[in-house]
Every structure is written in C-alpha cells, then in structure tokens.
Amino acid sequence: MTISTTSSSTSSKTSSEKGDDLKGFSSSSSPASSRSSSATTPEPSSPTVLAAKTIESIDPFQPRKDYNENVLPAIPATEAVQPLTSDANTPDHWIARDERMIRLTGKHPFNSEAPLSELFSKGFLTPQNLFYVRSHGDTPRVTREQAENWKLKVHGLVEQEVELSIKDLKEKFPTVTLPITLVCAGNRRKEQNMVAKGLGFNWGAAGVSTGLFTGVYLADILDYCKPKNPLLSSFPSYDVAVPGRARHVVFEGADELPKGKYGTSQRLNWALDRCKGMLIAWGLNGEDLSPDHGYPLRLVVPGQIGGRMVKWLERIEVSDRESQHHLHFHDNKVLPTEVTADQARSEMHWWYDPKYIINDLNVNAAICSPDHDQVVNVAEPSTSSPQMLPLEGYAYTGGGRRIHRVEISLDDGHSWKCASIHYPEDLYRMYPIQGHEYFGTLDLSATEMSFSWCFWRLDVDVQADIIAKDVKVISVRALDEGLATMPRDMYWNATSMMNSWWFRVAVHREGENGNQIRFEHPTLAGNAPGGWMQRMNEAGLNPRYPQFGEAKAVESCKTDANTLAAAKEAKVDPKAIMIDPSKADTIITAADLAAHGDGEGPEPWFVVHGHVYDGTGFLKDHPGGDQSIRLVAGEDATEDFMAIHSMDAKKMLRDFHLGRLEKQDAAPPAATTEGEVLDLSKPFLDPKKWRATRLVSKQIISPDARIFRFALGSEDQELGLPVGQHVFVRVRSKNARTGETEMVQRAYTPYSGNTQRGFLDILIKVYFPSDAAATSAPAFEGGKMTMLLEKIDVSSPSDDLTIELKGPLGSFTYLGQQQIRWKPASAVRRVRKLAMIAGGSGITPIWSTLKAIADEVLDASNPSSPALDPIQIWIVYGNRTEQDILIREELERLRVALKGNLKVWHVLSNCTPENEANWSMGRGHITANVLRTHLPPPPAKPASEDELEDTLALVCGPPPMEKAVSDGLKQLGWDLQRCVVFF
C-alpha cells in the first residue's frame, strides 16, 4: 500500500488513538443486542449506552450506572459474519467467522489471528470476530437450550460441592466486568521458527486481543464452596502433592481432544485473590461469548497467557495436586534453550518440571504502523512544515503490572527515544460504573492492577530522522514497572513461546532518486512468505543476529558455533528424511493418486514435494484430528505440511511413504484431436482415449455441493458408462503466473444414469479455500479440481482451460434385470436383496445403482421386460446433521414410488433431542445394532464355492464409518470378502 503522511501542523489523530484520551471517543457505535448472536445465554441483554453529552457535564471519579461512550472506549459490536465455505467440510461448518482472519493451521482446527493492521485499527477493544482464536480440536456446538441448562460443577476438596447454572452464578454472586487483554503464549512465534523450527505453528504479532469480560469472581465461588484445609505456601514445590490439603484449582472444558479434554490449573492462593481478577465469564463486549471464544462459559485469568483460560468450562476441582490433563504438561512451557525440538519430543522429563511452566505474560511490544510493505512517499524538504511519520504500536505485560516505558531506536539500539504512552484502561478508573444492568461493576478505581494493553506513539521527521541518518531499521522495546524489558537477542526455545526480543522493522529506500520508503516487518503470520527474517535466511545470513545496513555487525551479538548449534536443529534436508529410500524409485501414477483422492474414502493419499504418502495409518492419532488429513486427500499438501510441522513430524512421514508421483508430460496423452472425427453413433467414453467436453451448467445443491453438467458430443449421444462404474475427469489450465499448463485428474461416480443422453451429471462436494489476508497466501488453496470447476464461467468458455473425460473404470457393475457383475473373477450373479450403507458423500456410488434399479421398476414403457419380483433394498445413511443429507428428497420419492421395496433409515451423529426435537430416525453412529435392526440378515452360506449369494451389501463412507460397518457386518455374520462391496 502507498500512503502520504501528514505534516506536523496538520497531523490528524490515528485510529489507535480512538478512546485513548478524554475527547477522542465516538458516540456513534453501540453494541449489538446479544439476541443477534448465533446462540444466546439465558438472559440476553445489551449494555445501555448513553446518548452523546458534553464531556464537561460528566463528573469524573463518581460511580455511575451507565456506560457513557463520550468518555469511555466505544464498545465494538460483532460485525456481520456468516459460516464460511472454507469451513464447509469441517466439524466447525456451522460457525460464523470473519473471512479476514488468517488461518495458521490450515482449515481445521481453527487457529487464527487478524491482520495486524486490522487489529490495530479497531483500537482498545477488539470485536469478537477479530479476536484471535486458539483451539485444539472441534468447537463444541452448544445450543441456547443447552446453555440455559449448562452446569458448572465445583467439587473436590471443598466443604460444599455444587452445580451452578449461569442463572445461579448471576443470582448468587455479584456481576463484575473487567477490561482484559488476552495473549497467546505463541504470539510472535513465527520469528523463532524462522531461526529454527520449533514445535508450534506460525503466530504473527496479532495473537493478542482485548475485550470487556463479564462474569463473577472465581474467588466468590471458592469462598462459597469453602476449600478444605488449604495450603497456601510455596513449600513444598507445587508439583509435590500434599494429600488432603487444598492447593490447586483445576479447570476442565467440554472440548474432546485425542488425549482427553482440555484442562489446566491455578494455585489456590492466586484463585482466592480477587486482586488477580480471575473471572468465570459469560459475556464479552456486552455480548454472549461466541462459540470460538467459549460459549456459554469460560475462565478468564487477567495477566496470564491464554492457555490458562479454559473455554466451554464444565468443571472446577479443588485438589491437592496440579492438573493432570495432557496439555497442562505438554503445552505452554518455556524449556531451556539447550533443548531442541527433537529432544522435547523424545525426552519427557522436561515437560514435568514446574519451573518451566508459563503463567504470567512477559513484557512485549510491536510496531503496528507503518504496516508491512507500506510505502511512504518522501516529500520535498521543508523547514516550515516538516513531513512527520507516526510510529505506533501496542505494548503489554503480565501479572497486573503496568507498562512504564516504550523506547524507539532508529540506529539498531545504539540510542533510544521515549514514545508517548496511552492507557485507555485508566478511563475505567476515572469513570467507574456500578450497578449496570449488564456489566454489573466495571470499576478500576479501587485497584492499581493493570490487565490491558496500552498504545504508544512517536512522531519522527522523515527528512531529519530517517533520510538524513540513513535509517535501516526501526526497533521498539518496552519496560514494565518492575523494570523487566525486552531483550535484544532472541531466547530460542523448543515451543517457540513468549518470544519478546526487540520488534524490528527494516527500512528500505526505493523509487526514483530514493523518493519512497518501504517498511518490512520481520515475518508475516501463518504460511505467508515475506519479511526480513526470510530474506536474511535466503541470503545465507543468520536472522537470529540480524545486521541491517553496512558495517553494522556488533561483536557482542556474535556467539560461538557450539552455543548456536545447541539452540538450533541440525541442518538436514527435510525432503530426504521424509522419503523411504526403498521406495524412492516407486512410481505412483496420477490415476492411482486420483483413486485415493476422496477425503471420505478409506485410504486418503496426499503429495508432499512430489512424493505420495498414505495418511490412513495416522488418521486416528493426528493431533489436529483426521479432518486435517482428509482435507488434502489427492492434493499437494506441501505448503501446509512443511510450514506447520516440526522436523520430528517430517521424520514420521517416512513411515507413510508410497513412492514418487509420476511426472506429467507437457503434451497430453492421446485425446480427441482436431483431426479426429468423433463417431456420435457410439458411446462418448473410451477407456483408452480422453474425450474433450465442456461444463455447461452448475446446480447448487447445498453450500458445498454442486451438480456439474458436462456436454457430450451431441444431444443424443450415449455416455457409455455402466452402472456402478466411475469416470476420470481431467482439467488442464494455464497458470497465469508461469504460463505453464497444469493438469488435475480425479475419478467420480456420476449422478446421472447411462440412459441420459447428451450430458453427464456429477454430484461433487466442493472444497473451498481458506481466506487470505491482504498480502498473504491462503493456508489452504482449496481442492484443485473442485475449485477449477467451481470457478468456470459456463457462459464464457476460456481457451486457457480444457476438460476431458475417460472411462469407464471399476470392478462393480449393475447389468440390469437384477444382474450384478463382481468378484470373484467378474462373475455375474442375480441379486434379490441389497443392503446399502453410506456416509456423507459416499451416497454417490450407492445412488447410481439404486437409481438404475428404480428406473427399471418404474419404467412402464417396456412391456417386453420379464416380470421379476423387485429387488428388496435397505438403505442406512449416516450424516452429521439433517442439513448434511444429500439427495434426501430424491431418496424419499423413490421410497414412496417403490411401494415397500425400499426402506431408508437415516442416522445423525450430531442429532440431539434439544436441537432436533422432530427427528424420528437414528441418532449417534451406525452400529451393529443399527445394522441388525435396519438391514436384512446376511445370506446363507452357499453349498459350494461356485454358488454365488443373492444378497450383497454396498458400502461407501469415511474410514471410521466403514470400519464400524465392517465390524458390525462381520459380527452379524456377513462374509466381507464374498458379500460386501466397498466402493
């Protein structure tokens, strides 16, 4: 971006100053009613905001019942957001989110931060939609009715165990609101990962947000329950349990993770101290908590890292020992810098030392303006009106301490200037609120504790301070009231947490005659390339000890090789450690990859650096859940995998290596050419030749499902695809950036039958990309094939894109008249009963067979067909929610038309009595009992090997479902090899 800065005489207030002084607040905005949130707590109520008045009429230091935005920071309402297509195929598909948020761990789980400039522009209070999000798995889906009945259990070493609803909390204890800054311990982590990759993903400098949290003091709840025999001393060490002595308070949330629920703990003596400000909160900025931020109830611990603040809070236990939850030990630690990432993975003793745990935040600051890659046009020198450039940013610290000093250096730390500091939270000391209908007490006048960030600013003369002094870097550091400061040198650690070295922005003279200045931040959040640290790495320099400009080496910054090696991972080629040497020459064809490209199929394969890997064996153990693997099935996952995973994870990939993906020739294999005349009297498809087609229409079935229609050679041409078989679709497109032709190929089962002429319809789930920030690439670019099809303008064909079809392929075929060709040896059998079990998009191959059978029964135009008893068909179809059921109406129409010969049973895994009161079918998962109740019994064992059973089961769905179905069918007596077809 390019801006022109103002002169000192006309300098206007910047966005970061909104709410920073007594006259800089807008009275135009007010918080949205909590009724507008997607889910509400039992007593929705918006804060009352007074109409504009003159500031002179408002008495400071006098408690009031109203929130007055004339003198207090404007409360930001959650901005208009909706569920995103990038979440459509994840368990979080129902959550409304802001498309501007930068995703740090691919599509799922949702870990994100706002673009730094967007965050800073919002001022002191951050709207919920731009609040950073840290989640370890699926977000619990809590309905309003469930929230009204939500119970917080308080138990353990207490005189009185209780279960409290949110209504109970409001009635039993005083309501309190505090302005609190939340910070992820990984804030600014990517800077450490640019030195040596640690165990965590790439947070930028916007893993911080501030809001008004409303709830009750944790101390009030503990006083009510009365801890037994409390031990408040620091001796013995906190990792030593003293039986029967209440010493720790353990918190547990509702989120289910691979290694148990998320939980952590606080020392009892801290939890009993109201000065610590620990809240059990239900509100944020006058609204209910959003799902991503813990709806309906969470713990908030001012001055500590976000990892101590349990969301979706269900349980509080007073205990004689600290939390025993997995992530209480294996996360949120700053290990000694000598411990490499690999050591941290393999040497467990490091994680259990209480001296390495992170509680309080450390002092930190960042430059938010100028933004990364921002360009300032340099004005002609003027003595009367110098061109001024405001340097601005945030600073914070922990433990209730206050930032006392922010300093700026324009010469890499040789000299420093103090910036002015604005403390918006002090307005809640000058204008306290008591007895507010929503906030209760919002009054900092009785405490010196500081729980919020502050903003700093220093105006510099562009000519005198930047140009004349040939400034190469701008640095910022902050000091708190304990004189703790930000160090010059990075303290690298295996978790890459609590990074707080100087925040440096490189300065570049550009343009004709150097009439422009461009600013370069150290990194960009997530997987986005850019920043001076990456540039130094690529130049062979060490960004841990950066040198800006000429002759800027500082001897005291240097270190010996042994010290540096102890803090960095060994320089190894990550590509080499991911490859099994015995399979390095094994060639995997594009067709093989395409056959395993269904994210809900039994064996999802993916590509990293041109090699193919089978993710099946790691679906159950993947820390981010199996969705993270399924979402890249059949795709090139290089960017996401390399950016997120540690060297140890890259080594693990070798166990799943299959071989090298075949290279695609620049010229296409044999396909329809200009010189070839297509015989329209023959079927369109050819198993040995690609046939050119075009996309002629797209029918939207759901937010992430489409029926794509492809034209054949003529309106009367037959497709030539037997029922139950698949077709290859290949798309060639020209890369606008490189000019090269790229190819994507997938196998699909058609939605339309072979009787349809002139067209081929395919029902496809579209994998949409995650959204990018203004200058960053998306964490997930979407399904290559599905996004190519989605973006095609059917009304305006492009010469840069071609679509081709080839087929058929597959081992199962319905021949008609109750005849099926399948194994063994493509033998033909007559079937009388079919059990069809599908999950999600696995209904597609099931549908093609069902539709063909139904068409035969319902076709009255062919009286010569032999009269056969209709095939008896049972369908069990599993989905997450009712909205996820594909072709539901079509299934119902066939059920009615087939008059008792088709039975359909739907099973919803996310169906509960509260949100699906009218649902009359199955709930939960497809179990053996479901199969026993809603399918026919298995066929009798044939008298000889040559005799073929007349009953088959057809199965297609995600691997967990297929595994459960396999086990269930086997338990019920089905022969999986002879009688069960897995598509």
From Swiss-Prot:
Residues bound to NADP(+): L952, A953, L954, V955, C956, G957, P958, P959, P960, M961
GO biological process: nitrate assimilation
Annotated spans, Disordered: 1-50
Pathway assigned in UniProt: Nitrogen metabolism; nitrate reduction (assimilation)
Enzyme's top EC category: oxidoreductase
Keyword Transmembrane: no
Induction: Its expression is highly regulated and responds rapidly to nitrate induction and to ammonium ion repression.
UniProt catalytic activity: nitrite + NADP(+) + H2O = nitrate + NADPH + H(+)
Top-level division of the source organism's lineage: Eukaryota
All residue ranges annotated as the FAD-binding FR-type domain in the record: 688-815
Record-listed E.C. numbers: 1.7.1.3
Manner of cofactor binding, per the entry note: Binds 1 FAD per subunit.
InterPro entries found in the cross-reference section: Cbr1-like_FAD-bd_dom (IPR008333), Cyt_B5-like_heme/steroid-bd (IPR001199), Cyt_B5-like_heme/steroid_sf (IPR036400), Cyt_B5_heme-BS (IPR018506), FAD-bd_FR_type (IPR017927), Flavoprot_Pyr_Nucl_cyt_Rdtase (IPR001709), FNR_nucleotide-bd (IPR039261), Ig_E-set (IPR014756)
Cofactor dependency: FAD; heme; Mo-molybdopterin
Annotated binding of Mo-molybdopterin, by residue: C184
GO molecular function: FAD binding; heme binding; molybdenum ion binding; molybdopterin cofactor binding; nitrate reductase (NADPH) activity
Composition skew (Low complexity), residue ranges: 1-14, 26-48
Binding site for FAD: 746-749, 763-768, 780, 784-786, 841, 844
Record domain Cytochrome b5 heme-binding: where: 585-662
Function: Nitrate reductase is a key enzyme involved in the first step of nitrate assimilation in plants, fungi and bacteria.
Quaternary data: Homodimer.
Name listed for the protein in its UniProt record: Nitrate reductase [NADPH]
Native source species: Mycosarcoma maydis
